[in-house]
């Protein structure tokens, strides 16, 4: 190549470089089109499968009036917040679904929009509450909390979630958009080619690392009200806290994911039997790590922490962490550095009237 460069006139060298650059751009464009075509095909196949099931459901006669066993009539919704180890946790559910006999379904919204239209909310609620073929069901997707009670549903689904330190979550998302992860390393990401570090972005006041980008975990728990997505809304944070306490079965934290899995296995063995052992001793195929991630400097962190938005998101995170640790403290005991689930700690007595 070096010899050709010497022999080739400067103009031809320039043309060769330009031709190579054009060829690379064309190749990247074709790869992007192939990825988009693959995604469209996957969606079409998924819709076809759903239609087939619905057709069988119609031919066999409606089953929504059929009585399901209480253990089977369960729906879990994991409305996962991006970059909180959600894929790692979801893959555990996929690994266990055949063994534990339940279904896992991904809720794929257009452009990952976490807010559904009113008509889609109605469809979604009706779909998963009457789709008995998919029960017990574990649904997961990047959607904000949806209150099933306001749609007149008799039996609400079980909500679970995981949240993360807000700055760590934003840093992970920033690099994910540029470099992807080790789960699908060949997939082209939206910001691929941008080599700017998170520190440089914050120093320059870039939009991808602005404090407003921290506002995500609160609206995901707050829900579908317009005020939930009003950045910095105190009402939204209060509503998110209320939902976390009153509407969520369990909310864990990324930093203590194993303990979250252990508590789920103890409380909901129908879905999570074997999950703790899989997490501890499995091949870790479910784990996912963002590529090329660089930890921010203390100066960068300090600058973000001056924002009122960070203060609110961090307050919500600390609130969730305190609640999770409270639940864990009453469910496990520690021995030799390891945690063990407590046995049943209540019983019934003085039962009247006495049976003959």
Curated annotation (Swiss-Prot):
It comes from the Eukaryota. Disulfide bonds join 201-209, 222-228. Residues 29-356 are lumenal. Homotrimer. Interacts with the C5-epimerase GLCE. It is found in: Golgi apparatus membrane. Its EC number is 2.8.2.-. This is Heparan sulfate 2-O-sulfotransferase 1. One of its GO terms (biological process) is heparan sulfate proteoglycan biosynthetic process. One of its GO terms (molecular function) is heparan sulfate 2-sulfotransferase activity. Widely expressed. Expressed at higher level in lung and brain. Weakly expressed in spleen. Adenosine 3',5'-bisphosphate binds at residues 83-88, 164, 172, 279, 285, 290, 293. Residues 24-51 form a coiled coil. It comes from Mus musculus (Mouse). Keywords: Coiled coil, Disulfide bond, Glycoprotein, Golgi apparatus, Membrane, Signal-anchor, Transferase, Transmembrane, Transmembrane helix.
